Amino acid sequence: MASTTSDASEQESANPSEKNGDGSESGLRAADPEPAVKMDEADTDEKPGGHEPTEQSPEEATRDGGNDEDGETEKEQQKSPGSADGTAERMKREQREEESVSLPAEKNSGGGGTGMKRRASLEMMSSSSDGEPLSRMDSEDSINSTLMDTESIPSSGRSTPAMMNGLGGASSSTKGSSYPCCWDQCHMLFNTSPDLAEHIRGVHVDGQRGGVFVCLWKGCKVYNTPSTSQSWLQRHMLSHSGDKPFKCVVGGCNATFASQGGLARHVPTHFSSQNSSKLSSQTKVKEESPSKAGMNKRRKLKYKRRRSLPRPHDFFDAQTMDAIRHRAICLNLATHIESQGKGHSVVFHSTVIARRKEDSGKVKVLLHWTPEDILPDSWVSESDRPQLKTKVVHLSQLPQDTAFLLDPNIYRMFF
């Protein structure tokens, strides 16, 4: 029995050493011990039934290798010494059958690579047959799968051990601070918009001196545009910070606004809606009371009649004003009431239209006054002519029968 097993082991160990030079042949030879063990098991278990031996995968051989060889040794010990030669011949025959089955499959799959895989599986089987546990290989597979999982985790956005140890602190802090300050050369980050607004107001707005205030917010439409109003800059920066400090004063309303003007436009909407609701309720009450239906009808007719009456129109429009102004200018050019008469006197200008010499030897001239047809012509001494070139007459002293010729309004005012 011992000699038979030693011959089989020597034959198995000699097969890989004979073909070390050729990769494909070594792979084919290295695969021989595996089917020998497996087929022996299959033969001992399934030979009485008459079934053909089945080929097992390397994983199944790895799992069952240790138990199979233990069972094989126990069966061999139970056999008699007379059957040892028959067992060796049967193993050789099964070995040759397995070679004929495995050669086509290995040629189709590439020979050398399959041989290396066979050799690795044989090493695993030998280690398992020697009694070593397969926990080392399982642990290596689990480590490889763990490394692959950890490499794929950052791409999906989940936290990794490196990130938990502090390598991802920058990204987490960036996500937490969602309100950055975009002022020129300022890189502060804030968690809330009121904090950002307070920072802008205290550092960037109140920090400007000299009476000139500019907005240096990156991307602003009025970037670096000077202004003399600090209050304008404070209101303008609310649009960048997103803060809305002006809250609605009406109870139950949670609306907030970035400017006082927006709040002022919002508040009246509450009262207008209340008034409209009151009016609608009043109309409903009136419609529901039949006793007031006749009164409402009469009121409607009364209002309709009032609307149908012709409305008085004011004809003193812009064109009328222009006409009056033109007439006043022409009157002043003729009478100099405004320019020289101080608004209450008419200035008359004289021209000599005739001359005569009396018996006494005096020379007289006939003066004609303009504006015309107001004062009558008069004879004066030629020596008095220089003093009578102009004559100022108050409007109240004008002749009543000719004063209206200046202007009808003058006549209405003083006569």
UniProtKB/Swiss-Prot annotation:
The keyword Transcription applies. The keyword tRNA processing does not apply. Keywords: Chromatin regulator, DNA-binding, Metal-binding, Nucleus, Repeat, Repressor, Transcription, Transcription regulation, Zinc, Zinc-finger. A zinc finger (C2H2-type) spans 179-204, 218-240, 246-270. GO terms for biological process: chromatin organization; regulation of transcription by RNA polymerase II. Residues 272-281 have a biased composition (Low complexity). Coiled coil: none annotated. Residues 1-18 have a biased composition (Polar residues). Residues 295-304 have a biased composition (Basic residues). Gene3D superfamilies: Classic Zinc Finger. Residues 1-117, 123-142, 268-304 are annotated as: Disordered. InterPro entries: AEBP2/jing_C2H2-ZnF, Znf_C2H2_sf, Znf_C2H2_type. GO terms for cellular component: ESC/E(Z) complex. GO terms for molecular function: DNA binding; zinc ion binding. It comes from the Eukaryota. Residues 31-66, 87-99 have a biased composition (Basic and acidic residues). Its main location: nucleus. It is found in: Nucleus. SUPFAM superfamilies: beta-beta-alpha zinc fingers (SSF57667). Belongs to the AEBP2/jing C2H2-type zinc-finger family. DNA-binding transcriptional repressor. May interact with and stimulate the activity of histone methyltransferase complexes. This is Zinc finger protein AEBP2. It comes from Danio rerio (Zebrafish).
